[in-house]
């Protein structure tokens, strides 16, 4: 009987810990929504809140017009763990802070360790935005051999023409795969459809007219309360139909 009681207490404690963690992760997502980071879209996986799907749209600088998909992996004890969240791109991305082998983004220069209550995921995404807007400025004061991709850093500093050419290859590749079949059946995976006038035209017209709220049920309501991750891209362009 005592053993059963102890087991129940452990189960209850684990359940409470899990619920508390879920609320903290939800709070992180709400903060990201409130920050309205331009060109970055993320959503937690439906199946696992420690895994997030994201897309980065380059709006300026060398990476303008890029559409890079990435995954965020949170530590098991996030946000209490001092371990850093991981950002992993789904394709080759040449950048001094991106490992050419694992495609992971090194965030340790901005976040030596994760400080619960002080560091937040929106700051991590803002860092991603900043280092792609100005990659050269992002490596100032850092020794080249301390960077994840020292070859990219050398090119950026000494052969910018070649660096730009390789960035353009990455951008071209990202656009070629934007409409690929999702690698997962997770309903929160961010999906893009080619522009269809009969389906997406009315939405575009409302946006052009400056209407911030649509009268039709949202994608989330139409799916029984679950977000589908669906988005739309105008044909010939790679910008989501949003008010931004």
From Swiss-Prot:
Cellular component, GO, one term: chromosome
Residues in UBC core domain copies: 20-176
Pfam families on file: UQ_con
Major localisation: nucleus
Disulfide bonds: none
UniProt cross-references to InterPro entries, sorted A to Z: Ub_conjugating_enzyme, UBQ-conjugat_E2_core, UBQ-conjugating_enzyme/RWD
Superkingdom classification of source: Eukaryota
Knockout consequences: Embryonic lethal. Hypomorphic mutants are late larval/pupal lethal and display frequent telomeric fusions in larval mitotic brain cells. Unlike other telomeric fusion mutants these fusion events preferentially occur between heterochromatin-associated telomeres.
Location of this chain's protein in the cell: Nucleus, Nucleolus; Chromosome
UniProt keyword terms in alphabetical order: Chromosome, DNA replication, Nucleus
Gene Ontology terms describing biological process: defense response to bacterium; DNA replication; sperm individualization
Assembly description: Interacts (via N-terminus) with cav/HOAP (via N-terminus); the interaction is direct. Probably interacts (via N-terminus and UBC domain) with ver and moi.
Further comment found in the protein's record: Multiple telomeric fusions result in multicentric linear chromosomes that resemble little trains of chromosomes, hence the name 'pendolino', the name of an Italian train.
The family this protein is said to belong to: Belongs to the ubiquitin-conjugating enzyme family. FTS subfamily.
Function recorded in the entry: Required for efficient DNA replication, probably through involvement in telomere replication. May have a role in telomere capping of heterochromatic chromosome ends.
Name this polypeptide is given: Protein pendolino
Organism: Drosophila melanogaster (Fruit fly)
């Amino acid at each position: 009987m005592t053993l059963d009681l102890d087991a129940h207490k452990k189960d209850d404690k684990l359940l409470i810990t899990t619920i508390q963690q879920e609320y903290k992760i939800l709070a992180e997502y709400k903060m990201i929504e409130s920050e309205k980071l331009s060109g970055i879209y993320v959503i937690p996986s439906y199946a696992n809140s420690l895994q997030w799907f994201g897309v980065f749209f380059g709006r300026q600088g060398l990476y303008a017009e890029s559409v890079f998909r990435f995954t965020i992996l949170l530590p098991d004890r996030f946000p209490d763990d001092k371990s850093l969240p991981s950002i992993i791109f789904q394709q080759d991305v040449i950048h001094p802070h991106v490992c050419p082998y694992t495609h992971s983004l090194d965030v340790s220069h901005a976040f030596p360790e994760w400080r619960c209550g002080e560091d937040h995921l929106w700051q991590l995404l803002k860092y991603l935005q900043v280092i792609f807007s100005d990659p050269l400025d992002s490596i100032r004061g850092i020794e080249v051999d301390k960077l994840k991709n020292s070859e990219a850093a050398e090119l950026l500093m000494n052969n910018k023409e070649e660096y730009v050419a390789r960035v353009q290859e990455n951008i071209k590749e990202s656009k070629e795969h934007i409409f690929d079949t999702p690698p997962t059946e997770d309903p929160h995976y961010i999906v893009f459809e080619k522009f269809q006038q009969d389906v997406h035209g009315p939405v575009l017209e409302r946006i052009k007219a400056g209407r911030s709220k649509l009268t039709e049920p949202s994608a989330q309501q139409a799916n029984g309360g679950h977000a589908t991750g669906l988005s739309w891209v105008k044909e010939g362009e790679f910008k989501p139909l949003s008010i931004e």
